[in-house]
């Protein structure tokens, strides 16, 4: 699984696969709807030469990926020595129009003149619909091929530099009735020029080139997205009239302007990390919908195996994504996210497990009925706490009093009241909820740390608002939680933080001593534990138990973590966020050498575009799960920011 190139204008988002093919097309939200879900919906790119066709996903092609220096514009170099062809792509999603732009430099690597035909293929399951009611039609007068279903319309077109449009086309059914798709029509270099079809449909267009020995030509391709035929044809005609090159220039200019705060900071970043820092910042922006949702990952590859994907807004993940942006001075993204959370907030004051980009509840495997026999909302309390804590940090950073006017009564008060009330009076700890890793219903050290930090921060805001009732109530609960946590969640004999406590059916609690790095990190970063000597010892205990080595500084989430593990008896996968947490701890302690070794190792595991996966297999070194994972990118940025001398 990987999308080494992500392109976005915060409404249309496109993911390119390791073969340089369009594999995810999200519209009209980032993360929703994916119109290329499932097998065979990738948009193939093929070259016919010397009597046969070769697709980029075939053997023989090697692809190199990069981003332009200061813009979310992808660059791909695809070479096939066997057929003597090189394709150089520059790719972008236009920042003003909902359209994917691709310029393709087709190079003949042989000395003789050759007939070369470039094929661009489009395949959709529009709106993630299983109803097979899509339509594809050729519009010869507009030099476009359109795909539509209801209020989702796409228009594909292209020109050879000099103005000539595609010269052949084919439309048809794929994945049904024994048909593989219209791309197979290109096997002989010719297309059928069929003009309309409905059902599960695809299309292919051809550009015919005559390339001199070691010569080249450039093909310009675009795919417009809209909610009506009129809209996509308007975009299509603008690309033609303005030229694709002008649209690339406008898009590059927009990104250069947006990157100004990050570039200012990057001047103080070590040169070897500077480009990865900038790229990671752009990747975060690419996953933020203009209406506020922050998507965890748009890598839709898991859907090819009929699993759910990560194209949701987890409030907690969003907090970690937004924090480095706030630190660099970005305002709009956080403001829109808080608006999103305010709209999503339940009447009781909590946020749910995860959300779709349109604000609706996301899919969830969490039950209302819990192992201890209780029935309660299936929430992860740390998500509500994290958002509240981030808002307080955001306000402190900006000093913008209009934030309190807009959000204090409508979001801060209900969140803080919920957190203060969701406490077990016997333990003075938060009641059980699902843990950070979405697996266990229990009281965790990590969640406890976030709750007390959020309540302390909210109490400080209440002081500024002269809300004495809120300030006293929230600070009192926070102090009780912190005091109780130091007694119940730290094991002085093991010199370790517990994962947490599991509530039994009779209301008592049983300690869970599983070593979990989130417990250590939560206690450290959210100030849960005052005894610094014990805190340092707990971290060392964790590192010893995990046989940690700086030479290969990978760490799992917790003991015996089976998620994406290659085999039942294999070691648990390493998570980049956990290694970066440790680097942040080292920096706080003044151990810059150890931190830099971790940062360097993480950077070495990234794609050339800076893309980081969620996990890697510690044995094979293979990336696992989605890539990019915004949380990984964000922790990389946060750690780099921590290295900068204030």
Question: What are the residue ranges of the model-derived segments?
Answer:
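An extended acidic
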Residues: 1-81, 149, 154-183, 250-276
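Short Pro-Gly-centered flexible turn/kink motifs
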Residues: 65, 114-115, 208-231
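Polysaccharide-binding surfaces and accessory modules of carbohydrate-active proteins
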Residues: 1, 77-79, 83-188, 203-205, ...
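Helix-terminus loop motifs that line ligand-binding clefts
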Residues: 65-70, 75-77, 293-302, 312-313, ...
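Active-site acid/base region of carbohydrate-active enzymes
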Residues: 165-179, 267-293, 338-366, 375-376, ...
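Extended ligand-binding clefts on enzyme/binding-domain cores
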Residues: 155-178, 272, 276, 346-356, ...
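Low-complexity, Ser/Thr/Pro/Gly-enriched N-terminal "stalk/linker" regions
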Residues: 1-12, 20, 163, 182, ...
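C-terminal capping/lid segments that line or modulate ligand- or cofactor-binding pockets
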Residues: 1-46, 310, 321, 352, ...
């Amino acid at each position: 699984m990987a999308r080494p190139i992500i392109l976005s204008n915060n409404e249309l988002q496109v993911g390119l696969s390791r073969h340089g093919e369009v594999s995810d097309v999200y519209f009209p939200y980032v993360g929703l709807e994916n119109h290329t879900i499932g097998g065979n919906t990738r948009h193939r790119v093929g070259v016919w030469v010397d009597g046969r066709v070769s697709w980029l996903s075939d053997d023989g092609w090697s692809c190199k990926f990069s981003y332009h220096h200061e813009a979310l514009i992808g660059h791909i170099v695809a070479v096939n020595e066997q057929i003597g062809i090189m394709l150089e792509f520059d790719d972008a999603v236009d920042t003003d129009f909902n359209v994917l732009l691709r310029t393709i430099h087709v190079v003949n690597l042989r000395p003789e003149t050759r007939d070369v035909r470039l094929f661009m293929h489009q395949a959709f399951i529009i709106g993630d619909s299983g109803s097979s009611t899509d339509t594809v039609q050729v519009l010869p007068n507009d030099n476009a091929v359109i795909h539509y279903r209801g209020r989702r319309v796409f228009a594909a077109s292209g020109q050879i530099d000099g103005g000539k449009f595609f010269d052949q086309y084919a439309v048809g059914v794929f994945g049904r009735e024994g048909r593989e798709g219209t791309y197979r029509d290109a096997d002989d270099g010719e297309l059928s020029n069929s003009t309309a079809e409905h059902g599960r449909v695809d299309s292919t267009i051809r550009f015919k080139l005559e390339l001199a020995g070691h010569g080249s030509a450039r093909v310009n391709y675009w795919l417009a997205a809209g909610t009506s035929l009129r809209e996509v044809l308007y975009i299509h005609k603008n690309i033609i009239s303005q030229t694709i090159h002008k649209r690339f220039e406008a898009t590059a200019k927009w990104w250069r302007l947006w990157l100004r705060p990050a570039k200012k900071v990057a001047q103080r970043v070590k040169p070897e990390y500077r480009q990865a820092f900038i790229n990671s910042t752009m990747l975060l922006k690419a996953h933020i919908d203009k209406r506020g949702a922050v998507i965890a990952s748009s890598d839709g590859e898991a859907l090819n195996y009929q699993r759910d994907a990560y194209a949701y807004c987890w409030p907690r993940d969003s907090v970690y994504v937004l924090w480095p942006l706030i630190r660099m001075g970005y305002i709009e993204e956080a403001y829109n996210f808080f608006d999103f959370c305010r709209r999503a907030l339940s009447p009781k004051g909590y946020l749910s497990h995860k959300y779709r980009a349109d604000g609706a509840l996301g899919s969830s495997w969490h039950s209302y009925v819990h192992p201890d026999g209780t029935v309660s909302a299936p929430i992860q309390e740390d998500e509500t706490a994290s958002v509240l804590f981030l808002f307080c940090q955001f306000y402190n950073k900006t000093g913008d009093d209009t934030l309190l006017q807009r959000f204090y009564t409508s979001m801060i008060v209900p969140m803080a009241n919920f957190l203060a009330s969701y406490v077990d009076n016997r333990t003075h700890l938060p009641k059980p909820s699902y843990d950070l890793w979405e697996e266990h219903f229990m009281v965790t050290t990590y969640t406890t740390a976030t709750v007390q930090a959020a309540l302390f921060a909210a109490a400080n805001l209440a002081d500024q608002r002269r809300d004495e009732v809120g300030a006293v109530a929230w600070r009192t609960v926070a102090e009780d939680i912190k005091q109780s946590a130091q007694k119940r969640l730290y094991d002085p004999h093991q010199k370790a933080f517990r994962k947490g406590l599991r509530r039994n059916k009779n209301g008592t609690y049983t300690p869970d001593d599983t070593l979990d790095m989130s417990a250590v990190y939560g206690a450290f970063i959210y100030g849960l534990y005052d005894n610094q000597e014990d805190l340092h010892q707990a971290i060392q205990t964790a590192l010893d138990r995990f046989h940690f080595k700086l030479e290969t500084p990978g760490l799992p989430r917790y003991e015996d973590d089976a998620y994406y593990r290659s085999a039942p008896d294999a070691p648990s996968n390493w998570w980049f966020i956990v290694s970066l947490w440790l680097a942040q701890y080292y920096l706080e302690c003044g151990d810059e050498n150890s931190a830099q070794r971790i940062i360097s190792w993480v950077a070495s595991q990234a794609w050339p575009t800076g893309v980081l996966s969620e996990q890697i297999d510690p044995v094979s070194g293979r990336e696992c799960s989605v890539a990019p994972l915004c949380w990984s990118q964000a922790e990389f940025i946060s750690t780099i920011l921590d290295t900068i001398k204030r």
